[in-house]
A protein has these predicted regions:
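Helicase motor core with emphasis on the C-terminal RecA-like subdomain
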Residues: 9, 13-16, 20-29, 33, ...
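Short, charged low-complexity linear segments at domain edges
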Residues: 370-400
């Protein structure tokens, strides 16, 4: 979807670039013969010297959207990026393709800074990655002001907004700096997740009210989604990771304590596992992140502090040990799976305790009642997702404002029908009558106590023990009733107010049930880990592998790992898994055949072609 802007800016004399020329750049440097559908329009806009906002899901190839224009334009492209590790990975990935790029952040010595700036001023660098914190220095701002800037790119642009899930105050410096320049350059802002609030902040704070806005669909068809409600989360996690022994995964936990618990259990199970949270030293976090990125660890257990700083494309699963606080965070974190476009799994393990933990954190960390109310509404949407009996993918897309013509995706736990439908109309009527009989003045805890027949002081004083529904569900445990209430909210039978003490009220749907016009069903899940052994990665990734290619794929992975260690690079920067899969399937024997593999550009062909051809020839499987 494009919202057309009108402003053009011509600061440097720019060449007219045709689509064919841009495609030649794409094939030469990146090894692809065509743009993805979402890439072509923002690339064309930047080449026409028009401001752009790109809201594109992880894995859609948003970096290409500004890297191709950077190669085509005269002058320098400045890229603002939030994390040092993310900058390094991206610059290393460009350098390995012979694209002149550099970075400036706090890790550089004065000598390294001077050398980099000399190369920039000499026109030897096309893309310069900068941490936005550097804009706090007047000296550095003056240095940048003298450069021939063709375009400025703001990556992870949601960081500029307090409405976003990863607000960084340093991003506010970018807009101020842009306004201070004698001539404003073309600006592109890119992010994987942005609600309308965040999008408006990006426009306002970066001066992009007239930008072309490209919103690519949030759907990631290669990702399967599941919600598992189980009290035995640890057993599930250990079993799952064992079943996926040859695959990379991330397990997110809400607290440091849970990170350590899961890490210790997986370590005892013999898994190559790392852990990452704010309680660890910078050195330990750096070591863990590097080991995971270099494929020395199979799985990383982490708080949400981990992830944005890593550009790892071959993550095959993301497990959430607890429910995240909101859908924005979940989409961002789950989206770290399958960035190479190959199938991956996103599984959320839910417990009612998660809700109380997040409510407490919201109340403790957010001061203003208005902001608390916003966060509590977001939390309720996350809870509704966990109890959604319809398509999870459709729910997620609708949350982000994207409509769908289909009702089922056949690739989520709801659509796959991983459970039995149980009629809970009796329980629903009891709960609805309790809410109606108390004039819709209470929340889930009080209603649960009433239908269970608990003679608390509060209930007795109010006379609620005289209600006809008092004790009607005395044989149902508290946890199950509260779970049903959450499901009824998610299904639209009940409304839950926001605020510190949410109050339940009936909708028209509940009134239909009470009138006997409608029955209510609950999905009772079968909680189990798929009984398959670890998936053959080649079969999983493409579904087109020939017999024996799985062994060759693993052989090529080990070869890539050795090359990466020798060069000091992340393995996936040499070639992503998807390229190795094609190599294992196609088994090229000449450089010409090797160069025809999608994702192999000229620079990588020259650097690694003969080495991989030899590895393929040596394989005896």
């Amino acid at each position: 979807m494009n919202q057309q802007g009108t402003r053009k800016q011509e600061n440097l004399k720019q060449p007219v670039v045709t689509k064919q020329q841009a495609l030649r750049m794409l094939e030469t440097y990146f090894g692809y013969t065509s743009f993805r559908p979402a890439q072509e329009a923002p690339i064309a806009s930047l080449l026409r010297n028009e401001d752009v906002i790109g809201i594109m899901p992880t894995g859609a190839g948003k970096s290409i959207c500004f890297q191709i224009p950077a190669l085509c334009k005269a002058g320098l492209t400045i890229v603002f990026s939030p994390l040092i590790s993310l900058m390094k990975d991206q610059v290393d990935g460009l350098l390995v393709q012979n694209i002149p790029a550099a970075l400036i952040n706090s890790t550089l010595t004065q000598a390294e800074f001077n050398k980099t700036m000399y190369e920039v001023r000499s026109g030897k660098i096309k893309l310069l990655y900068i941490a936005p914190e550097r804009l706090g220095s007047n000296f550095f701002c003056n240095v940048l002001r003298a450069l021939p800037i063709a375009q400025v790119i703001v990556d992870e642009a949601h960081c500029i907004s307090e409405w976003g899930h990863d607000f960084r105050p340093s991003y506010r410096l970018i807009g101020e700096w842009l306004n201070s320049l004698p001539k404003r350059p073309i600006v592109g802002a890119f992010t994987a997740t942005a609600t309308k609030y965040v999008e408006n902040d990006i426009k306002k704070l970066l001066g992009l009210n007239h930008a072309n806005v490209y919103v690519t669909g949030f759907d990631r068809p290669n990702l399967s989604f599941a919600v598992i409600r189980t009290p035995k989360r640890m057993d599930y996690v250990v079993h799952y990771v064992r079943q996926h022994a040859n695959e990379n995964g991330i397990i997110y936990c809400a607290t440091r304590k849970d990170v350590d618990r899961v890490y210790e259990n997986l370590t005892r199970a013999g898994i190559k596992v790392g852990h990452y949270h704010g309680g660890l030293s910078d050195e330990v976090r750096r070591e863990m992140q590097n080991a995971y990125a270099d494929d020395k660890l199979q799985v990383m257990v982490a708080t949400n502090a981990f992830g944005m700083g890593i550009d790892k494309s071959n993550v095959r699963y993301v497990l959430h040990y607890q429910m995240p606080r909101n859908m924005e965070s979940y989409y961002q974190e789950a989206g770290r799976a399958g960035r190479d476009g190959a199938p991956a799994e996103c599984i959320l393990l839910y417990s009612g305790q998660d809700v109380q933990v997040h409510k407490y954190l919201i109340e403790q960390s957010i001061e203003t009642p208005e902001r608390q109310a916003v966060e509590l509404r977001k939390l309720q949407s996350m809870i509704d997702y966990c109890f959604c009996s319809n398509c999870l993918r459709k729910y997620m897309l609708n949350y982000f404002g994207e409509s769908t013509v289909w009702t089922t995706c056949d690739n989520c736990s709801s659509c796959k029908g991983s459970g039995d439908k149980v009629n809970v109309t009796k329980e629903a009527k009891a709960i609805f009558r309790a809410i109606m009989g108390t004039d819709e003045r209470y929340g889930a805890s009080m209603i649960t106590s009433i239908v269970r027949g608990e003679r608390t002081d509060r209930i007795m004083r109010a006379g609620h023990d005289a209600l006809p529904v008092f004790g009607l569900l005395s044989d149902v445990d508290e946890k199950s009733i509260k779970g049903l209430i959450q499901q009824f909210v998610a299904s639209g039978y009940l409304r839950s107010s926001t605020g510190k003490y949410p109050v339940l009220s009936l909708t028209a749907g509940a009134e239909e049930v009470l009138a006997g016009h409608k029955e209510v069903e609950e999905i009772r899940q079968h909680v189990s880990v798929p009984s398959r052994t670890s998936r053959s990665t080649s079969t999983t990734l493409r579904g087109k592998s020939s017999s024996g290619s799985g062994g060759l794929f693993e052989h090529l992975r080990q070869h890539r790992k050795r090359l990466a260690e020798k060069a000091g690079l992340r393995p996936y920067l040499i070639f992503p898994d998807t390229v190795l899969i094609d190599l294992a399937n196609l088994r090229p024997t000449t450089l010409g055949e090797f160069g025809n593999v999608k994702g192999v550009g000229e620079a990588k062909l020259k650097k690694y072609g003969l080495s991989f051809l030899q590895a393929i020839a040596e394989y005896k499987g």
